[in-house]
Amino acid sequence: MSTGKIIQVIGAVVDVEFPQETVPNIYSALIVTAKNLTMEVQQQIGGGVVRCIAMGASDGLSRGLDVTDTGKPITVPVGTATLGRIMNVLGEPIDMCGEIGATEHYGIHREAPTYEEQSASVATLEVGIKVIDLICPFSKGGKIGLFGGAGVGKTVNMMELINNIALKHSGLSVFAGVGERTREGNDFYFEMQEAGVVNVEKPELSKVAMVYGQMNEPPGNRLRVALTGLTMAERFRDEGKDVLLFIDNIYRYTLAGTEVSALLGRMPSAVGYQPTLAEEMGVLQERITSTKTGSITSIQAVYVPADDLTDPAPATTFAHLDATVVLNRSIASMGLYPAIDPLDSTSRQLDPLVVGQEHYDIARGVQGTLQRYKELKDIIAILGMDELSEDDKLVVSRARKIGNFLTQAYHVAEVFTGDPGMYVPLKDTLAGFKGLLAGDYDDLPEQAFLYIGAIEEAVEKAKKM
């Protein structure tokens, strides 16, 4: 192990000089022994000098401090010892429950599975949320993105999906909190304890491993914490297990890359993002895949800056996903939750050969009705409802009922709303929308369809109105 000295500190970026013959490799982990700080090599800039990112606060660093090259990348504990524990980017426990007794450690930088090793699946994952199961069904072993601006419900939807899938799913889950609120991470941990998914007394009985690099962490932590979580998920997958990987929020991973890129002296590209945006996203996303031994189904929240889906960060993420769930502020402003836009959300599973002809026809029928209503809104605003033809009046009436029927009470929102959460099986969802499109419920008031599960509840609700 060679030793070097710090020669420059600029925020989270540190330059270290080593003897010419022992310059560390890119992505090698270096340790500032006096401060017990880990750094990662990003560039070799000549003359034995390497430029590194600090994986922690660089406060108190000074020129001349000794730095040791470990000769290997950052390694983190993997395997069952990580279950039920909260770790940071380096795999160190931050839950005050003692050491992690892992026998194996993996480097966080690994190759994506080869084309021969990968395995595609067309099996559909039922999540019990009507709008998702109908319009943008998830695939087992697929990648799903939850897109939305600030405050439209990405984290609540993510938590409901964890509640509906992870709690009913017999496999293991990994949750990576990337640059999000510490309070949400804390709430998540205690909710998982209440649900029995995390067992503090017997961690080996837990079903989820948690890796946090939250908003207050330096950019180095936020840039690498997603890779730490992914490495743990890959280990479970390679054991032949079906793993769920939740990442909240993938945009903060991009943003950390932007912060680091500027400090490393790279020329910014569009909107100030790093020039390596597409490559950094690809390196992460290509590893999130299913192989012939096991599967990783990943659900990622994606913050959309200023509600602009054409922003380079969300636009780069789109290319990697199998299903996109787009949250719309205008739907949220009408008090309709989940605020998922059925016209913007897509899934490659919505194919008659995968979900069946009936499901496909119902989904397209719902979208067609909502699209026609969207087109008529301008006419209604100018001329009023009376100027519409009878057919168009019927379309408007059905579209409003469909919009209301797409709402649903969430288990995780029970504490705020007081309404008990509900899980709606796919067959009930299809039966309800089929009846609405066929006109079976044209005589019911549209308020009867708000926040109900199966369509029969609307009939009962209408009787009380």
Swiss-Prot record:
It is a peripheral membrane protein. It is found in: Cell inner membrane. ATP binds at G148, G149, A150, G151, V152, G153, K154, T155. GO terms for cellular component: plasma membrane; proton-transporting ATP synthase complex. InterPro entries: AAA+_ATPase (IPR003593), ATP-synt_VA_C (IPR055190), ATP_synth_F1_bsu (IPR005722), ATPase_a/bsu_AS (IPR020003), ATPase_alpha/beta_chains (IPR050053), ATPase_F1/V1/A1_a/bsu_N (IPR004100), ATPase_F1/V1/A1_a/bsu_N_sf (IPR036121), ATPase_F1/V1/A1_a/bsu_nucl-bd (IPR000194). Coiled coil: none annotated. Transmembrane segments: none annotated. GO terms for molecular function: ATP binding; ATP hydrolysis activity; proton-transporting ATP synthase activity, rotational mechanism. It is an enzyme of class 7 (translocase). Its EC number is 7.1.2.2. It catalyses: ATP + H2O + 4 H(+)(in) = ADP + phosphate + 5 H(+)(out). Keywords: ATP synthesis, ATP-binding, Cell inner membrane, Cell membrane, CF(1), Hydrogen ion transport, Ion transport, Membrane, Nucleotide-binding, Translocase, Transport. It comes from the Bacteria. Belongs to the ATPase alpha/beta chains family. HAMAP family: ATP_synth_beta_bact (MF_01347). F-type ATPases have 2 components, CF(1) - the catalytic core - and CF(0) - the membrane proton channel. CF(1) has five subunits: alpha(3), beta(3), gamma(1), delta(1), epsilon(1). CF(0) has three main subunits: a(1), b(2) and c(9-12). The alpha and beta chains form an alternating ring which encloses part of the gamma chain. CF(1) is attached to CF(0) by a central stalk formed by the gamma and epsilon chains, while a peripheral stalk is formed by the delta and b chains. Produces ATP from ADP in the presence of a proton gradient across the membrane. The catalytic sites are hosted primarily by the beta subunits. PANTHER family: ATP SYNTHASE, ATP SYNTHASE SUBUNIT BETA, MITOCHONDRIAL. This is ATP synthase subunit beta 2. It comes from Psychromonas ingrahamii (strain DSM 17664 / CCUG 51855 / 37). The gene is atpD2.
